[in-house]
Amino acid sequence: STQDTHHTMLIALAETRRDCVAFMSPYRSATVGVALSSTATQNVIDAFNLVPSSSYAVFDSGYKYMFDKYNDVFRFVPLNGDIAGLCAFTDQVADSFFSPAGFNRGNVRGAVKLSYNPTKAERDQLYRARVNPVTNFPGQGVVLFGDKTALTKPSAFDRINVRRLFLLLEKAIATAAKFQLFEFNDEFTRAQFRNL
């Protein structure tokens, strides 16, 4: 489908650049207007099963209902922008190697409600399928309750914070290494690089 093609192209772009992560939500009809929570869960899992494995992508579970102040209406909006925003917020209040999920840094703002609110069992299903559930906890707000990347096999890189840490490290090492170009390849130069 077109959705899978877009997701695959975004992943290919992120993997080619190797300096970013693609945040993706399921197609709108997977959760918006779906009466049964179990059906919405299966729709989300099915949507992302067609997308290739990658540590450069992050999947979320749906849409939030929010006020669109520019058009003066309430509407459902995909959560991928919010998840990217939580990563930026985490950088601001902590560091890239902290998880953007949970009650400390994973609060999704501006949500009136979710297109569907997965139960604990459904959250477990989603998490096993590489999807980060976003859940409304009564009295505590809407929270990103997972920190997986879209990688299918177990690895350190199947966590958002680990992938983001390595993006930061790779960039820092590349910046430092360029100043060692055309220098003598001797013990002094190597020690200087190690001690940067």
Model-derived regions: residue spans:
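Structured, hydrophobic secondary-structure cores that serve as assembly/anchoring elements
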Residues: 1-196
